[in-house]
Amino acid sequence: MKAIVYNGPRDVEVKQVPDPTIQHPNDVIVRVTTTNICGSDLHMYEGRTDLEQGKIIGHENLGQIAECGSAVASLKVGDYVCIPFNAACGFCKNCERGLTSACLTLNPGTAGAGYGYAGMGELQGGQAEYLRVPYGDFNCLKLPEDAAEREDDYVMLADIFPTGWHATELAGVQPGESVIIYGAGPVGLMAAYSAQIKGAGLIMIVDRHPDRLALAEKCGAIAIDDSKDDAVIRVLELTRGEGADRGCECVGFHAHDPQGNEVPNEVMNKLVKSVRATGSLGVVGVFMPEDPKSSHELARKGRMAFDFGELWTKGLRMGTGQTNVKAYNRHLCQLIELGKAKPSFIVSHQLSLEEAPDAYKHFDARENGWTKVVLRPQGHSAASKGAPVARRKTGTQHRHAH
């Protein structure tokens, strides 16, 4: 099959690799019809992680079941499914509590597993024609009948829609409240969209890319361009000097100041200053245990100079970490199905797998108009019209659940 393979920093290419196979009776093989390039893929693309050469990238995946292991009970060939980016077993101590982002089974020695991502285990990614999904009954969200026509909406359930929603959950956004969001990338836009759905009274979002700020305004946010205005001062002006009720951090360790210099603590400290006393923060931007290639000594050790004294004095609460996708994806799926949510508004490009290496270059450069890239491993027509799934031929016959 064809797949996007990581060769090294800023070097990915389409290669022919072996098809995945059923390795456990609970596995399923998914014929990937839509897969996204995620902003966090750029951490690996830029060489800021220890991703091994030869790894298939891609953790935002949607497709049709092509093959089922003998123990799979709820899925059948042809079903459209969306796969959470964090793979989980469903039966460990954390999974039983709904904390699927910290599964203790699939990545021995640490908490949390995922597809095609550094430090998250051996699973390959889904920027490919096929993907093996362990514990298929648990990990696959079966999609409604309109999935073939609305793949660009439903694929956002793999990561960024639940992650944006998670940011607002961690922050505790309630109807009528004000919320400040730092970062208008795909996750920040989904946080703004989630806040709008929840009925937030005032949504503010900080970035400096005009195309992203324009999208933020489409979901009811006041756009703050921090290359032109002091973001903290602007937030205080919009909130009668009090600060926002809630704050969301959707940037992570790659934060830059308005002059374009990488400053890892830039956003976190501004967020603390932007939220009112006794407010709360949701931090979903990726922060690394260590960042050896950073130009900042503290960041190389996974640390930052953080205004904890101000956080404490203001009595702020803070929630952090990866989203537990399965905690949200089913009811967010229903919002899409019922026409209450359309997260595909952020999609800027629909490309073939062969176009992905060039797309990575544009997306990494944050070029104007490159907001969210979706890839079609089976070609545009197969993805958009729901082409029938041919049964994959393997050396072993597997039961296909009905």
Predicted regions and their residues:
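Short, flexible surface segments
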Residues: 74-77, 175, 277
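C-terminal hydrophobic helical "lid"/dimerization subdomain
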Residues: 229, 242, 259-260, 269, ...
